[in-house]
Curated annotation (Swiss-Prot):
Zn(2+) binds at C16, C19, C35, C38. PANTHER family: TRANSCRIPTION INITIATION FACTOR IIB, TRANSCRIPTION INITIATION FACTOR IIB-RELATED. PROSITE patterns: TFIIB (PS00782), ZF_TFIIB (PS51134). This is Transcription initiation factor IIB 1. A zinc finger (TFIIB-type) spans 12-43. Stabilizes TBP binding to an archaeal box-A promoter. Also responsible for recruiting RNA polymerase II to the pre-initiation complex (DNA-TBP-TFIIB). Belongs to the TFIIB family. HAMAP family: TF2B_arch. GO terms for biological process: transcription preinitiation complex assembly. The gene is tfbA. It comes from Thermoplasma volcanium (strain ATCC 51530 / DSM 4299 / JCM 9571 / NBRC 15438 / GSS1). It comes from the Archaea. Sequence repeats lie at residues 129-212, 223-304.
Length: 312
């Protein structure tokens, strides 16, 4: 404790107490903090806290560093345990002799058993592997995966897993994480990478949101515009036109109480007609995960209320 406080005080020194100069030299060889102007030795027990090795590029830095990966909630033991590589090579990259490979195989097997020692850990390990699979298939970034893993762990602590499938709860946690981090994914998209029905995922999500007191804001139609337009290979002009239509619709209260994906799909469909990049209702509906009837209904409301002159 005393050493940490002393280290902190040394690190906070910015000026020479003798002449006031900011030209301070850290002499790690002699363990001294010296003023470059007047030569005063400010501290004579200065310790280099960095590594003792040198690296000349990022590859060398990574290979020589001995610290492990950062802690992560997406692994059941938070990444704090040791793994034995499946490559039959030692730490120097040399091949393991054939006579030692059977022993190494047994070590790997026991290490795997020890890492997951009880039913609760097996459940968590299985769930987080499933989460990783879903997130990978949906191209969901790491920060969202971390959030989803934390939500799932909270659900386990609240005993919300009992009577529900692991896959369903994981899907609900992933959808909740997407909503919290403003990375829009529809229930249909989540359901497309699971064996759980969309209705069940939605129900699990609502239960989680209520009991875990998740702070989730309602999703907005404009959150989906960029991704839907990208899937439909529409230009930036069409995207901007769709966003303009949505802003006008919000100003007159057309979006309240309606599904954001349906409104976004209709705005994109209208924008594609206006800019001449025509897309069929079926194509837009498939990307947005809504029905053609929904697009037609929202299309009619938007064109009539906003007085848009659109030729189908």
């Amino acid at each position: 404790m005393v050493e940490n406080q002393k280290k902190k005080k040394i690190e906070e020194i910015e000026r020479c107490p003798e002449c006031g100069s900011t030209n301070l030299i850290r002499d790690y060889e002699h363990g001294e903090l010296v003023c470059g102007e007047c030569g005063a030795v400010i501290e004579d027990s200065y310790i280099d806290q960095g590594p003792e090795w040198r690296a000349f590029d990022s590859e060398q830095n990574e290979s020589r560093a001995r610290a492990g990966s950062p802690m992560t909630f997406t692994i059941h033991d938070k990444g704090l345990s040791t793994d034995i590589s499946w490559k039959n090579k030692d730490s120097y990259g040399r091949s393991i002799p054939t006579r030692n490979r059977a022993q190494l195989y047994r070590l790997r097997k026991w290490q795997k058993r020890i890492k997951v020692s009880n039913a609760a850990e097996r459940n968590l390990s299985q769930a987080l592997q499933e989460l990783e699979r879903m997130a990978f298939n949906l191209s969901i970034p790491n920060d969202v995966r971390e959030t989803a893993a934390v939500i799932y762990r909270k659900a386990v602590k609240q005993n919300m897993i009992r009577g529900r499938s692991i896959e369903g709860v994981v899907a609900g946690a992933l959808y909740a994480a997407c909503r919290i981090t403003n990375v829009p994914r529809t229930l249909g998209e989540i359901a497309s990478v699971t064996r759980v029905k969309k209705k069940e995922i939605g129900r699990t999500y609502r239960i989680m949101s209520r009991y875990l007191k998740l702070n989730i804001m309602p999703s907005k139609a404009e959150d989906y515009i960029s991704r839907f337009c990208s899937k439909l290979k529409l230009s930036m002009d069409t995207r901007n036109k769709a966003l303009e239509i949505l802003r006008d619709a919000e100003n007159v209260g057309l979006t309240s109480g309606k599904g954001p994906t349906g409104v976004a799909a209709a705005a994109i469909y209208i924008a594609s007609l206006i800019t001449g990049e025509r897309r069929t209702q079926r194509a837009v509906a498939e990307v947005a995960g809504v029905t053609e009837v929904t697009i037609r209904n929202r299309y009619k409301e938007l064109t009539e209320k906003l007085k848009l002159n659109v030729e189908q």
